[in-house]
Amino acid sequence: MNQAELQRHMEEVSLQFFQKEFRHQAVFNARLRTTGGRYLLKSHNIEMNPKYLENFGLAYFIGIMKHELCHYHLHLEKKGYQHRDQDFRELLKKVDAPRFCATIPREITMHEYTCKSCGKSFLRQRRFNVNRYRCGSCGGKLIQTGSKKIYTENA
């Protein structure tokens, strides 16, 4: 999906679920990390996280669009648009939009180091120079034995 398709989808979702036009811009923002989308109060534009489309599919992504459009339409109508406001919660229920996003699985590379003397194994996220450090248990020399990718649910 590109920017033009996102704009078209946002306009269609707005008309279908809110019976109101979306007259501003919807753009992808890949720098968003822990949120599915963001409504900008000053410009009235909506930024969407493309990682949620890749990881969870179009149906889930449309739910995030509906959530952001709730903020958008309530703010323009000068009603309570924040998560804690009653107007916002009622509109979320009416259009069946999610209140929160699921976390995106994150890929972490773990580096494995092993002591030559005692054979103890260490896992670290950051690589380090094995010539500068020794085993904490026996003082032996370390060697890097490999690295592996781990997927976590924490973002």
Swiss-Prot record:
User: What cofactor(s) does the depicted protein rely on?
Assistant: Zn(2+)
Q: Enumerate the GO terms in the molecular function aspect.
A: zinc ion binding
Q: Name one Pfam family in it.
A: SprT-like
Annotated active site: 68
The entry assigns this protein to a family as follows: Belongs to the SprT family.
Put simply, this protein is called Protein SprT-like
Question: What is the UniProt remark on how the cofactor binds and its stoichiometry?
Answer: Binds 1 zinc ion.
**InterPro entries on file:** SprT-like_domain, SprT_Zn_ribbon, Uncharacterised_SprT-like
Q: Where does Zn(2+) bind?
A: 67, 71
GO CC terms of this entry = cytoplasm
